[in-house]
Amino acid sequence: MKSFRCRCIATLIGAAFAASAANAATIATFADPAPDGSTPLFAYDGSALTGGWSLGGLTLLTPGLPLVPDIANATFTMSPLTVNSVNGSVVLLSGGQIDFFDGVDLVFQITFDGASLTTPFGFGASEFAGYNVQFSGPNVPGDLSAEAFAFAFANPQGTPNDFTVTASFTSSAIPEPASLAALALLACAGLRRR
């Protein structure tokens, strides 16, 4: 009987483990803090993309950082990204780093090996997204995989080769489900002792 219960619990925990392994969770996100295009978050000049926000009004929501409360009036900086190539409306950019602050201290850092930028003057969505992404920071869990981020652009001003935009942001990752496997082992061990 105990063996049957152990198998049932292990199966349920294994199913939860498999389900969580396939689902990404939002780590941090924010809505566009700019009231209009006169206060952009990003600028592109045909050779580089620069960005950041130091004005008020950016609330960084942190559902995937349990030790970090949502941050009102957050700021961020980004290293300048140089253009590697242009293919129509898609621009491939160098890697870089984005740092989010609570006004003083670093709370969330994104590093990436490269990025793509779709220019905001064609049909469809316009965004900036990184690849080979890694999240870090003082309270960022170290057991994340498949990290990803994207900025969705709005309020473009300028031309396709020289523009500024405002943006909203989201980031996601798949939490490492190793803790669920440990729970399964503990549950089986607990049933064996009874």
PLM-predicted stretches and their roles:
Residues 175-193:
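A short, hydrophobic C-terminal helix/tail in secreted or cell-surface proteins
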Residues 10-18:
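Bacterial N-terminal signal peptides
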Residues 95-96, 100-153:
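Acidic, glycine-rich flexible loop segments
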Residues 2-9:
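Bacterial N-terminal signal peptides that target proteins for export
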Residues 17-25:
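Sec/Tat signal peptide C-region and signal peptidase I cleavage site
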